[in-house]
Amino acid sequence: MDPLTSAASVLSAALAIGLGSLGPGLGQGNAAAAAMEGLARQPEAEDKIRGNLLVSLAFMEALTIYGLVVALVLLFANPFA
């Protein structure tokens, strides 16, 4: 494999992990903050808020996992080699 292609693949993998976890991380923080605020305002809706929060956190975490998969493909099953 060409050294330039290898370096570009490693850099792309690093960007995929970094940027792929930045957005969901911020989103998860905002979602958790909104859930805590909702619980403080309406404690009787705890079950409904918790269920919605867990589902939305799972969807956000899936985006991070997609970034990890892209990075692993670039590192170990390089399509450009």
From Swiss-Prot:
Compartments, record wording: Cellular thylakoid membrane
UniProt entry tagged with the keyword tRNA-binding: no
Superkingdom: Bacteria
Keyword Transport: yes
Topology in the lipid bilayer: Multi-pass membrane protein
InterPro entries the UniProt entry points to: ATP_synth_csu_bac/chlpt, ATP_synth_F0_csu, ATP_synth_F0_csu_DDCD_BS, ATP_synth_F0_csu_sf, ATPase_proteolipid_c-like_dom, F/V-ATP_Csub_sf
Keywords in alphabetical order: ATP synthesis, CF(0), Hydrogen ion transport, Ion transport, Lipid-binding, Membrane, Thylakoid, Transmembrane, Transmembrane helix, Transport
Chief location of this protein within or outside the cell: membrane
One Gene Ontology molecular-function label: lipid binding
A single Gene Ontology CC term: proton-transporting ATP synthase complex
Gene3D superfamilies: F1F0 ATP synthase subunit C
Sequence intervals crossing the membrane: 7-27, 57-77
A Pfam family of this chain: ATP-synt_C
Disulfide linkage: none
Record-linked SUPFAM superfamilies: F1F0 ATP synthase subunit C (SSF81333)
Residues with site note (Reversibly protonated during proton transport): E61
Described purpose of this protein according to its UniProt entry: F(1)F(0) ATP synthase produces ATP from ADP in the presence of a proton or sodium gradient. F-type ATPases consist of two structural domains, F(1) containing the extramembraneous catalytic core and F(0) containing the membrane proton channel, linked together by a central stalk and a peripheral stalk. During catalysis, ATP synthesis in the catalytic domain of F(1) is coupled via a rotary mechanism of the central stalk subunits to proton translocation. Key component of the F(0) channel; it plays a direct role in translocation across the membrane. A homomeric c-ring of between 10-14 subunits forms the central stalk rotor element with the F(1) delta and epsilon subunits.
Similarity-based family: Belongs to the ATPase C chain family.
Subunit structure: F-type ATPases have 2 components, F(1) - the catalytic core - and F(0) - the membrane proton channel. F(1) has five subunits: alpha(3), beta(3), gamma(1), delta(1), epsilon(1). F(0) has four main subunits: a(1), b(1), b'(1) and c(10-14). The alpha and beta chains form an alternating ring which encloses part of the gamma chain. F(1) is attached to F(0) by a central stalk formed by the gamma and epsilon chains, while a peripheral stalk is formed by the delta, b and b' chains.
Record's protein name: ATP synthase subunit c
Natural source organism: Synechococcus sp. (strain JA-2-3B'a(2-13)) (Cyanobacteria bacterium Yellowstone B-Prime)
